[in-house]
Amino acid sequence: MFSVTFNSQKLSDLISAELAQWRAKWPSTTVLNGLADGLVHYTKGGKRLRARGVQLGFSLADGASQLEDACLTGQVAVELYQASALAHDDIVDNADLRRGAPSLHRFYESWHRSEER
């Protein structure tokens, strides 16, 4: 019998860690911190179907345990790409919500207005 284990929480933690690494490289400015906050907010949730596909392909290819970190890196990359595609789609469609929360451009719009003082 074939089984694939997928850990959505671990993937979410890795995405947050990746974004935290990006944030650590940026100068500590309000603008860049706000951008990072938006990315963290936008990459939470979802079914993670593409990442599950990466995991399934890795497992079907008889994924070796020493390559698990590379598989997780691939999952993070696919999820970040998907988030960018969804953000683009929301802009084109002028959508206010994504998964019941403000779409990324609306999140940034609200954040930007709160910073205009």
Residue map of PLM features:
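Conserved N-terminal diphosphate/IPP-binding helix and adjacent helical/loop segment
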Residues: 1-78, 83, 87, 91-112
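Conserved small/polar residues in nucleotide/adenosyl-binding loops
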Residues: 116-117
